[in-house]
């Protein structure tokens, strides 16, 4: 499964202090590699760099994330997109393993979603499977504001699981009705 530079750095920031340049949001990266001098850079890679003599050229493939590790990069200027600095002297294998864990997490999630669809699992199960990736509460509602599935929402104050059935949920229904996507979908 391919991931974006922004998503990888989002997860890395949970484990390491880091600085980043502008990061791409398109999922183009597929695996990490340790950078070695005089090797041809390959598209779609996350390169871990610890070499003090590393010089970024403008003639490299576009879909690469450069992850520079060590105090020697503390003042390195982030001049190009998809550059990230971990300004600590951390063993490369620890960062490499963390990146591998991120790819494994998303691969397992993707596989579980595919398996659930093959089993014809419910929408509720799909929401539950997504909890490891998107921890926020989620709710899927129909055009008539009936709650089809939800995760981590307290629905006890809604009669018949319908948004708008109580005064507490009127504001939610009003804001949903103001959304241009609702009107577009409703009148198709």
Language model: regions and residue ranges:
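Alpha-helical/coil-rich non-catalytic "connector" segments in signaling and regulatory proteins
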Residues: 1-188
